[in-house]
Amino acid sequence: MALVEVRNLTKVYPLGQNVFGRGGHGEVRAVDDVSLQIEAGETLGLVGESGSGKSTIGRLVLRLIEPSSGSVSFEGKDLVLLGHGELRRLRRDMQIIFQDPFGSLDPRFRVEDIVAEPLVIHEPGSRVARRERVRELLRAVGMDESALPRYPHEFSGGQRQRIGIARALALRPKFIVADEPVSALDVSVGAQIVNLLAQLQRELGLTYLFISHSMPVVRYLATRIAVMYRGKLVEVGPAEQITTRPQNSYTQSLLAATPEMTV
């Protein structure tokens, strides 16, 4: 049984009205009848251009937004059918790393509080135990305890993304959606973050849905690759096959348009 299974997933948004109350007819199918599976321990790379629906899929898989139709199963449980309490318990096992490492961190909070927030919510315990867990998490992402009393604006973009990764790891999740986690970083820093994610996967047995517009980034990290175009899944297969023998013309154009990534 796959860890994550998506069946016939669709997300439809109505077209908005203008200031005169006109328009609003029709709809946009951000995700259109998508089915895919993610096996435990693998990285499924979800790649496509801006507006392809890939980030919407990431949010649907975590049920951060509701689907228009279709199902999302995690360890055999249909998330769409779960009540708030059951879903809250499953949140421990499913986390997200956001694209913007600054916007995703509350600027009013110190690093210690940011990383500890999931522990406060899901694992009430002593402050001493939480602080030790936060130290452990920071070490895991290549930072030290000198970061604890500092605020997000005091760090570089790469360091902020490491803090976001530490927070995502706090509850020892099985599955992480990494939504364009290096697109806001320069190439060298982004490569360091990709290497960190690969290392954490090896050490912790994580499963990733890695979302990116960059085929070279996805090619480096992914076990399998799924290609999105205008809300539809146009090609899925092993990473080596997709990157060397693509069948779909859009996949071919993505490969031709992007340079190699040095990691």
Regions flagged by a language model, labelled:
Residues 70-78:
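Conserved ABC transporter NBD signature motif
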Residues 170-174:
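A short, proline-enriched helix->beta-strand linker immediately N-terminal to the Walker B motif
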Residues 77-78, 128-146, 255-256:
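Conserved ABC ATPase "signature" region
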Residues 62:
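Helix-to-loop junction immediately C-terminal to a conserved catalytic motif
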Residues 151-155, 159:
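Conserved ABC ATPase signature
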Residues 20-25, 79-95, 113, 121, ...:
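ABC ATPase NBD coupling module
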